Amino acid sequence: MKTIELFKFMISAKSQTPDDGGLLDFIQNYLDDFEAIRVDVEGVKNLFLYKKFSQGDHLCFAGHVDVVPAGDGWDSDPYIATERDGYIYGRGAQDMKSGVAAFVQAIKDTKHFNGTLSLLLTSDEEGEGTYGTIEVLNYLRDKSMLPDFAVVAEPTCEMVFGDAIKVGRRGSINGYITLRGKQGHAAYPEKSINPINLIAPKLANMAGVDLDNGDEFFSPSKFVITDIRAGMQVTNVTPNELKMMFNVRNTTLTSQKEIREFVEKNLEDLDYDLRLTQGSYPFKTDTKTKLVKNIDASIEQISGIKPKHSTAGGTSDARHMAPLGIDVIEFGVINDTIHAINERTTKDEVKKLYEVFKHLIDTWK
């Protein structure tokens, strides 16, 4: 089986999160000369394969086989790899069955490596992610088996293949504000305390405000209001309280402390509660490490392009690796149709991705 054939086969597996569509069993059998560890938790399937070729570094390729729901409106069956107009269409074509197929085949074709090669796959990345990659990493940590370096094959390229790798990600902090007032009749506003009136003049100083200036790798942390609601959906009663939710994709320059201080500064004269939760923490891999230098060289060798180092976009499972001391980057195909109707990629991109990963493995030292 070659890369494109493997890629098409993977698309045909209906692996809507957290279902793996049988892919983890298939891949385990496909790489039957690798040692296998299964860490299946609460219905989530996780697979770790490893093989020590020689003394040296431990390099891991990681990803997920689950996909988001396909939805309606596709021009072809989202679970049949369909070639049309120079593209291969199917759910997961970009995110991220192309990446998984590329590194699985690259590993399959490897006879020699300067160290240990491994593969980490989960069926729970697009969903909650609670019992996915993090469970495998915790197991490996307890067994002193964590990799030194990791490549997550998420789709990272923006305009052309090879133009970007992720060397980090912003964190994500969610905020929940409850602002208290005093309910009353709309005809007698002087007898009530309307929380809508209280918050209205404050919003201009909060919505969309940059909380830091960012740096050469991170765009500024921005205060993004995502929901405001109050009242009982009637016209003659003013609300007793208002609830507001917000999100901050934070850099390493902004933490919960700075966000709390920002809210307190703007709402200091109001009666409110604030709750913050950390969805993920920001991280950045040193761009001078062996991993970044080697992947840059492999991408440039195959694509002729020197990739930029980016931290843009949402979160990925790489966020679980960095805090454990693993040098991690992300690299994959163009990401312009991820989670979209008629998701697609090209044969050329998938083949080149395989070649990049194979070159990285073959030249690692």
Swiss-Prot record:
HAMAP family: DapE
The reaction(s) this protein catalyses: N-succinyl-(2S,6S)-2,6-diaminopimelate + H2O = (2S,6S)-2,6-diaminopimelate + succinate
Pathway given in the UniProt record: Amino-acid biosynthesis; L-lysine biosynthesis via DAP pathway; LL-2,6-diaminopimelate from (S)-tetrahydrodipicolinate (succinylase route): step 3/3
Catalytic residues of the enzyme: 66, 125
Oligomeric form and interacting partners: Homodimer.
Domain of life: Bacteria
CDD domains assigned: M20_DapE_proteobac
TM annotation in the entry: none
Cofactor note: Binds 2 Zn(2+) or Co(2+) ions per subunit.
EC number in record: 3.5.1.18
Keywords attached to this entry: Amino-acid biosynthesis, Cobalt, Diaminopimelate biosynthesis, Hydrolase, Lysine biosynthesis, Metal-binding, Zinc
Organism of this sequence: Sulfurimonas denitrificans (strain ATCC 33889 / DSM 1251) (Thiomicrospira denitrificans (strain ATCC 33889 / DSM 1251))
GO biological process: diaminopimelate biosynthetic process; L-arginine biosynthetic process; lysine biosynthetic process via diaminopimelate
Keyword Hydrolase in record: yes
Residues binding Zn(2+) 2: 95, 126, 339
Protein name: Succinyl-diaminopimelate desuccinylase
UniProt function note: Catalyzes the hydrolysis of N-succinyl-L,L-diaminopimelic acid (SDAP), forming succinate and LL-2,6-diaminopimelate (DAP), an intermediate involved in the bacterial biosynthesis of lysine and meso-diaminopimelic acid, an essential component of bacterial cell walls.
Gene Ontology molecular function, alphabetical: acetylornithine deacetylase activity; metal ion binding; succinyl-diaminopimelate desuccinylase activity
Binding-site residues, Zn(2+) 1: 64, 95, 154
Cofactors (names): Zn(2+); Co(2+)
Family, per entry: Belongs to the peptidase M20A family. DapE subfamily.
Gene3D superfamilies per UniProt: 1.10.150.900, 3.30.70.360, Zn peptidases
InterPro entries reported for this sequence: ArgE/DapE_CS, Bact_exopeptidase_dim_dom, DapE_proteobac, Peptidase_M20, Peptidase_M20_dimer, Peptidase_M20A
Gene assigned in the entry: dapE
